[in-house]
């Protein structure tokens, strides 16, 4: 493989752009389908399969394996906010004890990963402490730098001082109880549902599924460029399929 294209979703448009750029392999985050199905109708699923089969280009999805690696690009927003690991005494299970210390604390631990002769805890969502407590206005300003075009929705009331923040790109509202148990002041995620929002143990900021993971994949492409120097890596940007709509415009 000499040319690799990286994208969030394997949509027909993204696949066409990747192929027109000469991609010999396409790496997406989300799978083409979440469950097995037949190509029994002419839709986007059929179209993507036709495109990659005709071009003889493999399509690979790094989904939960990427989501669960706290040392990967999934932690990009935590890095930008300058979050650091919380004391082990504040976690539900104490210190993970898997060998390698992590810069952040994993929320929902699912196992371990091997790296450089050592192992470390992996799982979904991270939680960390701010170097300096933030006000809600401080947080707004920082998020505005990185979540351009996002229309966040807040469930709950933010405290006047925000010290500990949990983050889970994608759909992470199910982690709210564990984030609260770790003493988090806020959970940042996407895809928050109405009835879930009515019964949360801490404030949850829904910044959208797309905004966190699109930037995650852009940074993943940059990491691959740096670490796999003999492969030309192209990031294929996309647009949020959920566009803001104002009835007053």
Please provide the spans of the model-predicted regions.
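Active-site catalytic microenvironments in core metabolic enzymes, especially phosphate/sugar-handling
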Residues: 1-249
């Amino acid at each position: 493989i000499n040319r690799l294209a990286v994208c969030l979703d394997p949509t027909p448009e993204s696949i066409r752009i990747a192929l027109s750029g000469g991609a010999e392999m396409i790496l997406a985050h989300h799978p083409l389908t979440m469950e097995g199905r037949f190509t029994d109708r002419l839709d986007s699923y059929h179209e993507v399969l036709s495109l990659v089969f005709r071009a003889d280009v493999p399509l690979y999805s790094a989904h939960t394996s990427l989501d669960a690696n706290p040392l990967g690009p999934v932690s990009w927003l935590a890095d930008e906010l300058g979050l650091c690991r919380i004391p082990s005494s504040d976690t539900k299970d104490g210190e993970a004890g898997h060998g390698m210390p992590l810069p952040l604390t994993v929320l929902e631990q699912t196992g371990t990963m091997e790296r450089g002769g050592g192992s470390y805890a992996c799982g979904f969502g991270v939680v960390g402490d701010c170097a300096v407590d933030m006000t809600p206005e401080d947080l707004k300003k920082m998020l505005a730098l990185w979540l351009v075009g996002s229309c966040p929705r807040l469930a709950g009331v933010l405290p006047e001082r925000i010290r500990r923040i949990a983050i889970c790109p994608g759909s992470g509202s199910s982690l709210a109880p564990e984030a609260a148990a770790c003493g988090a002041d806020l959970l940042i995620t996407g895809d928050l549902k109405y009835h879930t929002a009515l019964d949360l143990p801490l404030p949850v900021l829904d910044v959208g599924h797309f905004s966190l993971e699109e930037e995650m994949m852009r940074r993943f492409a940059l990491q691959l460029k740096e670490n796999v120097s003999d492969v030309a890596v192209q990031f294929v940007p996309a647009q949020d399929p959920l566009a803001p709509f104002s009835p007053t415009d």
